[in-house]
Amino acid sequence: MDVDNGEGQVQVHLKTKQEHYAVPDVPYAIDGTVTTVELNTFVNALLRQKDGSSDTDFDFLVFDEYLRGRLCDHLREKAISFEDAIEIEYVERFPAPEPQDCLLHDDWVSAVKARGKWILSGCYDNTLNLWTNKGKHILTISGHTAPIKAVDWISLDEETGRFVSTSQDQTAMLWQWNVGSNSVECVSVCKGHERGVDSVSVSPDGLRFATGSWDTMLKVWSAELDDAVEGSSKRMKESGVRTPKITLQGHRESVSAVQWMDATTLLTGSWDHTLKVWDLSLEGIKTEISTNKSIFDASYSKLNRLILTASADKNLRLYDPRTNQGSVVRNTYLGHNAWVQTVMWSTTEEFLFVSGAYDNQNKLWDCRSPKAPLYDLLGHGEKVLDIDWSNPKYIVSGGVDNTVRVFKSRKALAEEAETK
């Protein structure tokens, strides 16, 4: 057997956590040059022998990484002996998201957030827009005096929606939307930053929100409607002006990303090449991770407790904030052809995330597949500025082509199939 050339056979065990797809747990001898194509054929043949199953598309994990070429090359790259019995895990392939809608705006769409039946977008023409997730325009909201940079929902029920927006006009604005009358009012203007406000995130309980700015500051504000700012003048209270509860200094350049990790912990990413984890109970930095690029966006997963970054190059990077080796990258994801502007973990699928870049493309990834995305989500004609997967049914993105693109994910596709 000429193992060095990947010829000959390899002993494998085929495993799956999806019990209805399980095959007999015995060693199989397969050619070392197989790819996912041949493995799919082999597994489906075994399933037909077992119970007459129709063919299913699978992906294959070998040592916790998706197989994307020949098995022998994969093993050689990981320095795995060809003499060992190899365990291959197979999983049903995640279906390709399908394009649903293109929502036309009057200017660049720099911020987008979906919740329930609704999509909130923010534009460079200083306006916010509300849409249904079926593509119907509901409302245009004016108030900011410079381009919108970020948006987030505070709360939503059948009668009322509340959300926050941030802008290059150095403010954040709190809004209350009456769903029935389709009217909206600005409840508070949040002042305290000295430059544009680039990022925003609402706390898990909806009582606070955090903002990051070009002034390098991280600020935490009350999101409660009846909040009275201690020490504020009567004029400020009556005019709805709100000031921050906490101001945290530590970054040296723009705070381009902010996210609540839990009720008392915040993650920030910055153009100063660092990620910081903040402990609000101590009002200080808990962990700092140094990177080698400016960070445009960062996303933390509550499911796997890992952090992804989008940076001033073509790559996405994965970090573990729990490690003692703060600068070590756990994985790098290659696939975009220009700067990656935006990234977000799935809120329901532990291994999946989406990204958008200046190459006009969105991509859907599995964090166990660093060499290639699962799918390209095409449609934008210009740079992608923001992407959101808050609603598990829909992947939503905004870009320089003045559009919001809506893609149906597996949950929406499954619901459609059930109703047919």
Curated annotation (Swiss-Prot):
GO terms for molecular function: ribonucleoprotein complex binding. Keywords: Nucleus, Repeat, Ribosome biogenesis, rRNA processing, WD repeat. It is found in: Nucleus, Nucleolus; Nucleus, Nucleoplasm. WD repeats lie at residues 104-142, 143-185, 192-231, 250-288, 290-329, 335-375, 379-417. One of its GO terms (biological process) is maturation of LSU-rRNA from tricistronic rRNA transcript (SSU-rRNA, 5.8S rRNA, LSU-rRNA). It comes from the Eukaryota. GO terms for cellular component: cytosol; nucleoplasm; PeBoW complex; plasma membrane; preribosome, large subunit precursor. Residues 10-92 are annotated as: Ubiquitin-like (UBL) domain. Its main location: nucleus. Belongs to the WD repeat WDR12/YTM1 family. Required for maturation of ribosomal RNAs and formation of the large ribosomal subunit. This is Ribosome biogenesis protein WDR12 homolog. It comes from Drosophila melanogaster (Fruit fly).
